[in-house]
Amino acid sequence: MISAPDVVAFTKEEEYEEEPYNEPALPEEYSVPLFPFASQGANPWSKLSGAKFSRDFILISEFSEQVGPQPLLTIPNDTKVFGTFDLNYFSLRIMSVDYQASFVGHPPGSAYPKLNFVEDSKVVLGDSKEGAFAYVHHLTLYDLEARGFVRPFCMAYISADQHKIMQQFQELSAEFSRASECLKTGNRKAFAGELEKKLKDLDYTRTVLHTETEIQKKANDKGFYSSQAIEKANELASVEKSIIEHQDLLKQIRSYPHRKLKGHDLCPGEMEHIQDQASQASTTSNPDESADTDLYTCRPAYTPKLIKAKSTKCFDKKLKTLEELCDTEYFTQTLAQLSHIEHMFRGDLCYLLTSQIDRALLKQQHITNFLFEDFVEVDDRMVEKQESIPSKPSQDRPPSSSLEECPIPKVLISVGSYKSSVESVLIKMEQELGDEEYKEVEVTELSSFDPQENLDYLDMDMKGSISSGESIEVLGTEKSTSVLSKSDSQASLTVPLSPQVVRSKAVSHRTISEDSIEVLSTCPSEALIPDDFKASYPSAINEEESYPDGNEGAIRFQASISPPELGETEEGSIENTPSQIDSSCCIGKESDGQLVLPSTPAHTHSDEDGVVSSPPQRHRQKDQGFRVDFSVENANPSSRDNSCEGFPAYELDPSHLLASRDISKTSLDNYSDTTSYVSSVASTSSDRIPSAYPAGLSSDRHKKRAGQNALKFIRQYPFAHPAIYSLLSGRTLVVLGEDEAIVRKLVTALAIFVPSYGCYAKPVKHWASSPLHIMDFQKWKLIGLQRVASPAGAGTLHALSRYSRYTSILDLDNKTLRCPLYRGTLVPRLADHRTQIKRGSTYYLHVQSMLTQLCSKAFLYTFCHHLHLPTHDKETEELVASRQMSFLKLTLGLVNEDVRVVQYLAELLKLHYMQESPGTSHPMLRFDYVPSFLYKI
C-alpha cells in the first residue's frame, strides 16, 4: 500500500508550484505617498508638523538703520500664537532684500532732494527649516530724521500651508494693499506735520542768526569780518538752503495724493483730505505762510526752537516708532484692518475656498437668497465699489425710507392664493401716502377638514355688536355665495364689485339654516376685519359659534350691505361685472368722510334663501379675493366705544398700541443676534418699515452659538418638529417664559428657521414684556414673551389666549407646545434629534444647506408660469390648482404639510418681487383656522 509520503515522492515539483500572480500596476493618480511626518505621530489632517507655530499670524518688521531687521509687532499680539517661532530670524529673511530700492536725495540735475514715491512690492517667501511660508508686503514710510527720509517696513502673513498662500495671493494682495494705503496716508500726514514744525524751527533759527549777525556787525569797528561772523554767515546760508529744501519736500508730500485721485485703494478718510487739499492754494516760498498753513488738521500752537548747526542724524538718536510715524487715527484703522485680514484668512484652505464659492453663489442667487441667507457676509466690498467715497461702518447700511418714500405696490397678491386644506382669512395692511391708513381684507376660499376635529379646536366667539347706520354686514348660509348688495338707506355709499366664487364644504353642524358668521363694522369707512382687531381699531368681527347639534352646513363668507337695524338684509343680487374692471376698482377712495367706491348695477332678487348671490367671474383670480379699504382716521368715536364693550382697558386705549409695546426701545442685543424692525411712533402702522440694520450681524461665533442652541432644543424637546414647521410655514411662534436669558437664547436659535421678508429685515422679536396686539403678528413671526407671575401679567396671558388660534405657543416653563399637527418629511431631515452632528457651526451649515434646497423648490414653483396660468380659456381653476398640487407632490416630492411650507415661501418671493422697492414690502397678516394640538413632555 502506498502511503502519503510515497505519493509525494512520485510527484513533480512543477505541479505544486503555482504560477506567480502579477498584480496590475496601480494607476499613477492612485499612488499616494506616505505622509512625511507619519513617524512623528502626526495625523494627516493636522497642519505641517514642521511648523513651530499653532496658527497663522501677521508680522510687521522694519529694516532699522541702527540695528538692522527687527520685528515690531504681531497680530494677534499673543506669544502663544507663534510659540517658539524665531521672529528675529524670519525678519532677517524677509527684509534681507531691499524690494523698495529707490533713489532719495539729490538726483542729477536737481539742486534739492526729491522724494520718489515707489509702489509697494509683494513677494512670497518660504522657509523649509522653520516650516513657514509668508506673503510679504513691502512698503516705505517717510521719516524726517531717517537716512534719506525713508524707513522700510514690511507686513507678512505667515502660514504653515504653502498652498494657502499661493491660492489666496490675489485676495491677500488686495487686503494688504488697503492696509498699506491707510498706513502710508497717515504717514504722509504725520510727515507733513513734521516738515511744518521743522520749517518753523528753521525760520526761528534764521531770525536768531540774523539778529546775532547784526549785533556782530555793530560791534565790529575794524571794517573786516571776524571768523565768528563768517561762521554765522555760513550757518545762515545753510539755514536758508535747508528752508528751501524743506519747502520743496512739503510741496512734494502734499502733491502726492492728487496723483491717486483715480486710484481704487484709498482708505477711509483719505478722500476727505484730498478734497480739502484741492481747495487750498499751493505752498508759497514764504516760510511764514508755509508754517502757518496747515492743510491736514488743526493742531495746537507749536513753539519753535533753535536748531543747532551740527547734524542731528546720529546713531545715538532714537528713531520714531511705527505709531509715531503715522497719524493716530490712521494707525488705529490699519491695526483694525490687519486684524480683519487675520480673521478673514483664518482656517484651512478648503474652508476659505468653500466660503468664497458660497459668497460668489449668493451674489448670483439674488432671487431667493433674501429668505434665509445672511447678507452681512455677502461681500461688503460690493458697496465700496459702487460708492466713490467710502463711508464709515455706521453709514454702510441703507437708510430707512420714510412712509412717503415707500411706493405702494400696484399689484396686490395674497399669501393664501393657493388652495389650503384649512379655512383661511388673510388681511393685507397697506400704508398709503399721507396720514390715512388703509387696510385690505381678503376672504379666501374655504375647504373642508374633519368636522369633529373642527368642533374640538375651532374657537368661535359669540359676542354682540351694535351696527351703525353705515355698517357693512357679511352674512353667510349653506347655499350662499360671495356677493355684495346695497341697501336703500345707503344710497350715498358706493360699493365695489368683487364677485368671487367661494367654494365650501361641510365643516360644522347647524340647527338653523340662517346661522351665519357676521362681520359687523361700526365705522363709516371700515373694511371687514376679524374680531381680534377690536383691541387696536374701532371695528369688530363677531363669529357665531357652530352648533354641534344641527343639520350639516357650511361656513360661508358673503359680502352685503345691511340697514341700520341688525339682521335686516335686503334681498337681491348684483349683476356680473364687466371683464374690463381693473384691480384698482377694489380700492376705495375717501372723500368728505365717506367711502367712495364704484357704482353698482341694479339688484336681482333671490327667493331661495334670502341672500344675494352672484355667478362666478372668469377674469377674477382666486387670490384677489374681496377687498375693501377703510380709514382709521375717520372712525366714529361713539361707534368705537360701542364696539369695544367688554374688552380690557389696555385694548380700548388706541395709544396703547404705541406706548405699551417697546416701539422706540429696541435693544442693541437684537441687532447682534438677528435684526428685526425699527419701530416708529408716528402712526399705528408706521412701525412696519424694515430695520435699516443688517439682518443679523452674524459672526462665526454667533452661528456656532445659534447652531448649538438649536441642537439642544431639538434633542431636549420631542415636539421640536411642529415648532419649526410653524416658523417655516409663516405661523407666528410665541416663546413664553419667565427667564429673559433663556427665552432670548432659544429665540436666537430658532431664528435660523425664520424666513425673512427682505434683505434688511428679520421678523424676530427677541423679548417683549407687554401684551401682544394684532399688529405684532403682522410684524413678527418669532416672539419672545415674558411671563409675569404678578397680577399685572394677567393682561399678557389674556391677550395671548385671545390670539392663540392664530399662533403657536411654546411654553418653556411648563414644557408645552400648542400648535397645528405636522406630518411631513422635510423637518425631520432638517432637525433630526438622532443626528451625529456635535458642533454648532456644523449644524448651522447643515441647516443652511437644507434651506437652500427648500428655496430652490420654492423658486421652481414660483416661476413656472404654466403652473399658475390657465392653458386655455375653458380651463377651470380646479384644474389649475390640481396641476399645481401635482407639481408639488410628484415633481418636487413634497408630502402633507411640506406643501404649505413651499407655498408660503413662494408667496414671499412673489410679494418681494412685486414691490418696486424690494425689502420694504409689508408682511401679510395671515390667519389659519386649523386645529391646534397640545404637546407635553
Curated annotation (Swiss-Prot):
dDENN FLCN/SMCR8-type domain sequence ranges: 844-910
Main location: cytoplasm
Transmembrane segments: none
Region (Disordered): 274-293, 384-405, 564-645
Domain uDENN FLCN/SMCR8-type: residue ranges: 48-220
Expression (tissue specificity): Expressed in all tissues tested.
Effect of residue 796 to A: Impaired autophagosome maturation
Subcellular location, record wording: Cytoplasm; Nucleus; Presynapse; Postsynapse
UniProt GO BP: autophagy; negative regulation of autophagosome assembly; negative regulation of exocytosis; negative regulation of gene expression; negative regulation of immune response; negative regulation of macroautophagy; positive regulation of autophagosome maturation; positive regulation of TOR signaling
Chain positions covered by the region annotation Interacts with WDR41 within the C9orf72-SMCR8 complex: 862-914
PROSITE patterns noted in UniProt: DENN_FLCN_SMCR8
PTM remark: Phosphorylation by TBK1 is required to promote autophagosome maturation. Phosphorylated by ULK1.
Polar residues: compositionally biased ranges: 276-288, 388-403, 574-583
Region called Required for the homodimerization of the C9orf72-SMCR8 complex, residue ranges: 1-349
List of residues that carry Phosphothreonine: 796
Gene Ontology terms, MF aspect: GTPase activator activity; guanyl-nucleotide exchange factor activity; protein kinase binding; protein kinase inhibitor activity
Phosphoserine modification, residue list: 402, 417, 468, 471, 489, 492, 498, 790
The cDENN FLCN/SMCR8-type domain, residue ranges: 318-835
Listed GO CC annotations: Atg1/ULK1 kinase complex; cell projection; chromatin; cytoplasm; guanyl-nucleotide exchange factor complex; nucleoplasm; postsynapse; presynapse
Keywords for the protein's UniProt record, in alphabetical order: Autophagy, Cell projection, Cytoplasm, Guanine-nucleotide releasing factor, Nucleus, Phosphoprotein, Synapse, Transcription, Transcription regulation
Family: Belongs to the SMCR8 family.
Role description: Component of the C9orf72-SMCR8 complex, a complex that has guanine nucleotide exchange factor (GEF) activity and regulates autophagy. In the complex, C9orf72 and SMCR8 probably constitute the catalytic subunits that promote the exchange of GDP to GTP, converting inactive GDP-bound RAB8A and RAB39B into their active GTP-bound form, thereby promoting autophagosome maturation. The C9orf72-SMCR8 complex also acts as a negative regulator of autophagy initiation by interacting with the ULK1/ATG1 kinase complex and inhibiting its protein kinase activity.
Subunit structure: Component of the C9orf72-SMCR8 complex, at least composed of C9orf72, SMCR8 and WDR41. The complex is formed of two protomers, each individually consisting of one molecule each of C9orf72, SMCR8 and WDR41. The protomers homodimerize via an interaction between C9orf72 (via C-terminus) and SMCR8 (via N-terminus). Within each protomer SMCR8 (via DENN domain) acts as a bridging protein between WDR41 (via C-terminus and N-terminus) and C9orf72 (via C-terminus). The C9orf72-SMCR8 complex associates with the ULK1/ATG1 kinase complex. Interacts with C9orf72; the interaction is direct.
Annotated protein name in UniProt: Guanine nucleotide exchange protein SMCR8
Gene giving rise to this polypeptide: SMCR8
